[in-house]
């Protein structure tokens, strides 16, 4: 028999970026908030010995235990899905702070085109992709989202500079970035020169890695980045990379109205008479069940888990690819990476770096170029970054290099700091056969069905990937002093084995119409107005940018909706 705990104003499932933002804003407004986190407590002090590439970079010390909960995967609706038991394609964060601890800090706003992609694409190109692609407007515009982007970027102390194509895209800013860009480097200047000679308009990556000492509007301090090269897959021991642990969570804690209960795995959302009443969870140390009543429930865990909890709790209609009916699980999207590596006799100090130390361009991103003769929509940014080459994970070798023995070692040593990659990150558009559902066979450690991922790259993806890959090769060839280039392979079937990105989106999409979305534009569930679902699952597609800035902006907008609902008790749609 589950023990019933004292009721709270708001309970969040998860204590990462979204849960932390919700907690900070609601506790400042006087509400009592409890976050249920299935991992353990951690803080900046836990990362003093984080420079262990084997433990964290290779064996994923900050990530979810796939033996207890994971997803199953198949390529198409007729296939057999099997469990994802070792982290590969994407890395699911664990513990307080979630993926916001091990991210790199790339902090891009989505384009105005992204939020109205169905309408704007149809106006310019008609039904170019056909009916199998389920493009959908988000129900908000860039203008609606801009104030929330501004808030998140000031929370993170973003270091950046204006995008030279911002005016063309209609991507205005109400204020400049809080800090100047990170240091420029010899390597990045080499890329910038080649990109400009290719008629690309370059700018520095917006980085949630602090250029200098910074105090955000909530009074939380960020230290200057040390360019130590241990950002992605690692926590920041300097407190220079913005994360929930050094921004929103301590702010929420300072109010005295916020509690985090760790080792608490939520298994069900409870409901009665059209409302949710709280959640059921298991203490993972004792396996004892508890019921946490709440006036408002906020799903703020990773997008896979948010979708799974709605499904196992029978809230919303499961998407059916055969009929096209239902919205829960619909429009799962990912991203594509492509690129070309250039090799030099000249050395670059690539052993130093930062998570978002880079230069990029948007000339072939979004709808910034004419797609009339192309077999795809949207695009990708073309960039180069100096994250820091680490000895185990970094092994750049030119074509034809030995792959074994003394000559292999010699080639590894020589090329370690003599390579520059020109990369691309491509948008992912929704397809009717890419979706999330519950697996009928496999269960997690608590007896609940695993979430099933049905996904493969599409003809749209392959055409975009080839186009951008060729563009990266053109830029790489133009770099001064280049000796040879190695162009990446064109896209094949999706594989969950090699790492690609932790930019999973969709499944709990937002919109202005309940027939095409799970939540409204304040992320309030259509079927239960005291339930809010926030995260990258709200995206109707994925852009050519990283998702975190948009996730943070949506979380700030969601908190406004929660406060409005708390006062009125009514739907916000």
Label each residue range with its predicted role.
Residues 25-28, 32-34, 39-55, 255, ...:
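Glycine-rich loop(s) and the adjacent beta-strand/alpha-helix scaffold that form part
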Residues 12, 16-17, 182, 304, ...:
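Residue-level detector of alpha-helix initiation sites
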Residues 40-63, 93-95, 99-105:
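Conserved N-terminal glycine-rich FAD pyrophosphate-binding loop of Rossmann-like flavoproteins
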Residues 76-122, 129-131, 138-142, 325-452, ...:
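FAD cofactor-binding and catalytic pocket of flavoenzymes
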Residues 203-208, 227-231, 262, 267-272, ...:
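A glycine-rich dinucleotide-binding beta-alpha-beta segment and adjacent secondary-structure elements
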Residues 59-72, 82-89, 106, 118-263, ...:
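Conserved redox-cofactor binding core of oxidoreductases
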Residues 1-7:
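A short, basic/flexible loop-to-alpha-helix module at the beginning of a structural domain
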Residues 8-35:
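N-terminal Rossmann-like FAD-binding beta1-loop-alpha1 element of flavoenzymes
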């Amino acid at each position: 028999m589950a023990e019933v705990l004292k009721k709270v104003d708001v309970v969040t499932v998860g204590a990462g970026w979204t849960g932390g933002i919700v907690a900070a804003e609601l506790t400042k407004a006087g509400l009592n908030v409890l976050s249920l986190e299935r991992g353990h407590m951690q803080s900046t002090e836990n990362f003093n010995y984080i420079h262990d590439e084997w433990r964290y970079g290779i064996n994923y010390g900050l990530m979810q235990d796939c033996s207890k909960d994971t997803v199953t995967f198949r390529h198409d609706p007729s296939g057999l899905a099997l469990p994802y038991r070792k982290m590969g394609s994407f890395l699911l964060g664990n513990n307080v702070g979630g993926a916001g601890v091990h991210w790199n800090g790339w902090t891009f706003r989505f384009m105005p085109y992204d939020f109205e992609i169905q309408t704007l694409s149809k106006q310019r190109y008609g039904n170019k992709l056909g009916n199998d692609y389920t493009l959908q407007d988000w129900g908000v515009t860039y203008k609606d989202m801009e104030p929330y982007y501004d808030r998140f970027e000031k929370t993170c102390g973003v270091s950046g500079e204006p995008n030279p194509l911002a005016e063309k895209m209609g991507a205005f800013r109400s204020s400049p970035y809080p800090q100047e860009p990170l240091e420029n480097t010899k390597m990045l200047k080499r890329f910038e020169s080649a990109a400009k000679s290719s008629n690309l308009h370059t700018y520095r990556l917006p980085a949630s890695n602090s250029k200098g000492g910074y105090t955000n509007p909530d009074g939380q301090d960020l230290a200057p980045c040390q360019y130590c090269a241990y950002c992605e897959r690692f926590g920041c021991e300097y407190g220079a990379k913005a994360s929930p642990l050094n921004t929103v969570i301590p702010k929420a804690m300072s109010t005295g109205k916020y509690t985090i209960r760790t080792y608490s795995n939520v298994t069900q959302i409870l409901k009665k008479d059209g409302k949710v009443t709280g959640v059921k969870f298991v203490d993972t140390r004792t396996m004892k069940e508890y019921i946490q009543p709440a006036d408002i429930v906020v799903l703020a865990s990773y997008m896979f888990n948010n979708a799974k909890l709605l499904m196992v709790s029978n809230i919303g209609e499961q998407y059916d690819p055969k009929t096209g009916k239902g919205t829960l699980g619909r429009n799962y999207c990912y991203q594509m990476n492509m690129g070309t590596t250039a090799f030099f006799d000249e050395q670059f100090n690539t052993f130093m770096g930062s998570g978002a130390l880079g230069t990029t361009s948007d000339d072939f991103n979004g709808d910034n170029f004419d797609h009339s003769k192309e077999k795809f929509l949207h695009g990708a940014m073309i960039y180069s970054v100096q994250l820091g080459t680490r000895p185990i994970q970094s092994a750049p070798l030119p074509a034809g290099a030995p792959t074994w023995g003394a000559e292999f070692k010699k080639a590894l040593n020589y090329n370690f700091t003599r390579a520059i990659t020109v990369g691309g990150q491509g948008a992912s558009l929704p397809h009717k056969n890419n979706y999330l559902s519950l697996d009928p066979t496999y269960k997690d450690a608590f007896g609940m069905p695993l979430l099933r991922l049905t996904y493969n790259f599409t003809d749209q993806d392959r055409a975009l990937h080839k186009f951008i890959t060729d563009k990266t090769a053109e830029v790489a060839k133009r770099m001064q002093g280049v000796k040879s280039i190695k162009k990446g392979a064109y896209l094949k079937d999706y594989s969950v084995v090699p790492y690609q990105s932790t930019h999973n989106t969709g499944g709990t999409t937002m919109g202005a119409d309940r027939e095409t979305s799970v939540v409204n534009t304040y992320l309030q569930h259509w079927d239960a107005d005291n339930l809010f679902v926030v995260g990258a699952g709200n995206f109707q597609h994925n852009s050519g940018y990283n998702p975190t800035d948009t996730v943070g902006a949506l979380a700030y907008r969601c908190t406004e909706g929660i406060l409005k609902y708390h006062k009125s008790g009514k739907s916000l749609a």
